[in-house]
């Protein structure tokens, strides 16, 4: 990604920071969350609780209109400016954040009271526990990926590759999960950046299977057989923030989300991902704990995609998928019906701190659905099928990456709107609380910005069986300026403008594919396919005499099975026709065979055989 000159970036930062920093409403004391108050009621004086302290000076990422990289610098500046504003119990280990101007620490009830009374503190919350969206089904580890992920064709990803040559190349996709096994053959060379927030290990790993499976659906290749990744040309920015069992602290998720915005720690480099796939959830639908994170991602140009959850039934979507700023993804089976486990909307907000919607506001969810049942993808040691909205979310995230490659200047709002507008509407007409806008259609989304591919028309094809090495296809096609071909799944030829395409084929059976190519390089992903057999030997006929019901019968056999004979193909010189001819007074002197291409072969019958 490009870089902004340092002097220009500083100027942009100064301007943006001047209008972006604001103070949260003042009060006699900070708001202590209901969950924290409940825990404090049963906490001894010498015990400590994990809390997140949010300070009043904040950068409003949701209203930020400056340069994206300037947002990172402004967020960092706000955090540094308030670094000494928190009352601590002497030397104390704290984690400071800049994504939201906040601090996490373990604090005693007395310290929490002092912090809440500080005029620079806006709120004190109990650190929330999150977990990976549990898989509903998981197969044993397999030695190959078989036919691959059925979802790739279901959402039109393969058509995007074939028609537009778009595979996600140049796009980075973020994933916050249990880690990734970078040694899986489908993920080798796919990791662009890595950070372990759980154990601090330098090299990528996955002590579960969840993260590696998600990663495979995002960018996996086809080393195990069939293709498993929707955007195989993209790379991954991976943050391990969940344990191998899929559990994690909210503060670790904030740290991972913050790192996603600036993996190399240099605001002048735009190394953040274009979309982040999240298959984890916090149980409370209207918990605004992660709202600043999602808003900051969007302000930076990152599409936030979240699994809806696997609880099933109405009103069961957790946060952050429940936010209007998030793309919540439900799961469908291969017959395009909603899975029983897929969490549904609507979400009714009971927000009391003013950070979310007004109490009683109803938000429709999910936003989209995607394949999430028996999805084949990578795991440590091989491949496996899994089911869950965790498997559906990466289909949508990778589709967003394909769309971003097709239209790099699209905003987050435009990407999401395009994915919804081009989705395959399922269930009741229009958006609903089971399927959202429908099943994501990557091909329709890309087509909407790049135009429809050309079509390949066939005026005349060569015969199925020919006796020459040269064959000619007479072609036409709507929107076509040229045509390309390949033989037996080899390399595609360079496009040629002529509508008469002559190919050289070796002897034998061949699969010939021809595609129309538009002036802008877009190709017809379907094209035409024909089987052509070259056999220059021609048919070989053998005749033998048998006795049938006391009569002498001559039977002709064709030795070369490559030739398919026309009906009534045996032509007896005596005028009789058929596969078997009964000798009468005068037996034929020869037999002629004609094949579907019109080629003939004649075999004389010895007089001794005819007697």
Identify what each model region corresponds to.
Residues 28-136:
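Inhibitory N-terminal propeptides of secreted protease zymogens
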Residues 218, 391-408:
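Short, small-residue alpha-helix embedded
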Residues 204, 280-302, 307-362, 374-393:
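Substrate-binding/specificity loop regions of serine endopeptidase catalytic domains
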Residues 31, 46, 64, 148, ...:
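Subtilisin-like serine protease catalytic core
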Residues 38, 149, 228, 270-277, ...:
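C-terminal subdomain of the subtilisin-like protease fold in secreted/lumenal serine endopeptidases
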Residues 260-287, 307-308:
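Short acidic, glycine-rich surface-loop motifs adjacent to enzyme active sites
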Residues 450-611:
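Low-complexity, disordered linker/stalk regions enriched in Pro/Thr/Ser/Gly
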Residues 70, 118-172, 185-186, 283, ...:
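Protease zymogen maturation seam
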